[in-house]
From Swiss-Prot:
Free-text comment about domains: The leucine-rich repeat (LRR) domain is disrupted by a non-LRR region, resulting in the formation of two LRR solenoid structures shaped like the Arabic number '7'. This is strikingly different from the horseshoe structures of the canonical LRR proteins.
Name of protein: Receptor-like kinase TMK2
GO cellular component terms, semicolon-separated: membrane
Stretches assigned to the Extracellular side: 21-460
Protein source organism: Arabidopsis thaliana
Source species taxonomy: Eukaryota, Viridiplantae, Streptophyta, Embryophyta, Tracheophyta
Coiled-coil intervals, chain numbering: none
Amino acid sequence: MIAKNFLLLLCFIALVNVESSPDEAVMIALRDSLKLSGNPNWSGSDPCKWSMFIKCDASNRVTAIQIGDRGISGKLPPDLGKLTSLTKFEVMRNRLTGPIPSLAGLKSLVTVYANDNDFTSVPEDFFSGLSSLQHVSLDNNPFDSWVIPPSLENATSLVDFSAVNCNLSGKIPDYLFEGKDFSSLTTLKLSYNSLVCEFPMNFSDSRVQVLMLNGQKGREKLHGSISFLQKMTSLTNVTLQGNSFSGPLPDFSGLVSLKSFNVRENQLSGLVPSSLFELQSLSDVALGNNLLQGPTPNFTAPDIKPDLNGLNSFCLDTPGTSCDPRVNTLLSIVEAFGYPVNFAEKWKGNDPCSGWVGITCTGTDITVINFKNLGLNGTISPRFADFASLRVINLSQNNLNGTIPQELAKLSNLKTLDVSKNRLCGEVPRFNTTIVNTTGNFEDCPNGNAGKKASSNAGKIVGSVIGILLALLLIGVAIFFLVKKKMQYHKMHPQQQSSDQDAFKITIENLCTGVSESGFSGNDAHLGEAGNIVISIQVLRDATYNFDEKNILGRGGFGIVYKGELHDGTKIAVKRMESSIISGKGLDEFKSEIAVLTRVRHRNLVVLHGYCLEGNERLLVYQYMPQGTLSRHIFYWKEEGLRPLEWTRRLIIALDVARGVEYLHTLAHQSFIHRDLKPSNILLGDDMHAKVADFGLVRLAPEGTQSIETKIAGTFGYLAPEYAVTGRVTTKVDVYSFGVILMELLTGRKALDVARSEEEVHLATWFRRMFINKGSFPKAIDEAMEVNEETLRSINIVAELANQCSSREPRDRPDMNHVVNVLVSLVVQWKPTERSSDSEDIYGIDYDTPLPQLILDSCFFGDNTLTSIPSRPSELESTFKSGQGR
């Protein structure tokens, strides 16, 4: 009897096990959490008896959930990871929301298709223990920003992994390209995300066939070289469109199965390799909107459809036509630098003598190659020696390594070779008459021979140091006596003007500096006695297309400002002075005042590069500011199609202007009062930092001359009361104008706007009234700005500062150093760019430099106030921070 009862109990337990599968509770929770459409027949408690979309094995364990394309909505329950026999999880193309539950530990899981839903997140352990996982698709889900979790490294059976348009960020893991661990992975699709990495280069034996990484979002995107492709010899389809990849195309000779190759809209440069356009398997290729150079490729595959439309820098349009030999040689030279983007952007066409950056020609012969301070990496190519006409090679201030090629010693016409301030090593070739500058180079080459030569090198180094010190001592003594003699001469002959032979001159050939045997030739530009650049009228006519009206940037009381472009693309601003403004001023007086202005250098003052005096023409050449005036960005941003300035940017601009004016008032070698400070005299660069323009120009107008419609220099709305009434000028005049500019930055309104109601015409009066009434002041803030509690706090401080600066009595206005201190405390982070000045002479100008490079160097030099202007008086030390750094 006992045995019979025990047998019945065992049967009952077995029956319960059959009826109550371990997966039953999980599946019922799944059913109850979803809103099913149609009639899926999910009734009853046994999921194995539900519709064909649920599959079970012989043990009543759920092995497949295949409910894709069913119009299902709802959230997935968190316990799906308990379905330990699950092999297929397919919920794609529904309306599912919430997080995807963790499936960690499901060793039998092969397929996960969750694409085209509204899932919000992926758990970090999602892929843990999924050793059988082969197929994954997470495309088109609005996940919170996520990265590929480390747990994916366990899924070494992966065949295809797709996470397109699902807010993926960060880096692509190296292991996905390692054939040893992921030998089955053939498809990787990560398009339309926010990936920002450079590709790994140390993987091997990748089996990936389909690689889709196109359309990454954000500013950085995927970048760096694509040379990793040549290691991926199984590739059939590659799509990298819409990223920031740069450098040359790799060797494709090993990619014999490649059918489709799309790298449109990147920054790839260099030549299209023959290994690509001779690839017979290729049927679809897209290279448009890059910076590719050399001849237009001629693809030979029978059914290929090449897409070369859009920007590139091919020398000729006809496929397969060779470039000019000079072009080929120059491209070989920059190949050693990795085909830098700045060359690819500016070297257009098939004639390097037609204005290519860094290239100067005499006739059709290249005589000067000037690649100074271009951030170049790589080595010096021996192909420089192919240009027998070369007289100057300047590769200084780059990051070049390796040795100086022996072939360069064969250049019989070479007069100057400057490779200073690089990372070169090895022996310098023997040149006959060439002046070679190698300072800042030559540590031991990493070739294993340093130890053998250590003892001999030590003696050489000691001898060299002693020789150099003696030479420097002799040179210093010689310079001292020469300068002393010259000073005595000028004291004896104060009225004698320097002739062409007395001035340092710059030779310009084809609007660019070359080298002449005597050192003096050409009249395109030279250095005046004060070291500022004197530029010929012809250069400026060419740069502005003969002062074409289409090039007008603006009109002011002192004349018209034109945009100019030198032959190599360097942009300048040319102010053509009204003849009535300077007619009463003597030539010497005008030149001396220009000399004063060209020496005023600060990062927040627009650089005056030089001038032109020919006949009745009086022209000033300024630094070009690409983003135009501040007024364009605060008053006319809608009309110009610009984005409104956010408050933090306005605050930084205010600080920039304050620093510039502070420098003029107290820190320059002599005090300046601007007298016409306003948004149209504040210019913005591409980095949206501000520089003050037209400072000191009132000095160029003779007494009594009207600079605008008033009898004084200034603009209504910005004029301090005492200046407008009496003409009395102090630095507090500029402080008042600055206060009005702060009001404009805060409100987006003009200082004087006759289109407004009578009580709102004058901004300063209206602003004070609004500020006093705290309840109405928020209405005065520019609606284009987003304002929160934090910004409102700083806005109130700046508003109070604006009122102080525009006080009626000058004594109630703060000095600009106080203004700077207030604004500095509000700008959370401001880090000045560190730049070192490298003076070539007493004026910091290299006479063998092309005019465009002089302009660039002048901008560079202008950023270093400590080298161009004497330091501030010591008694200001406790009051001011650095005039450059604040």
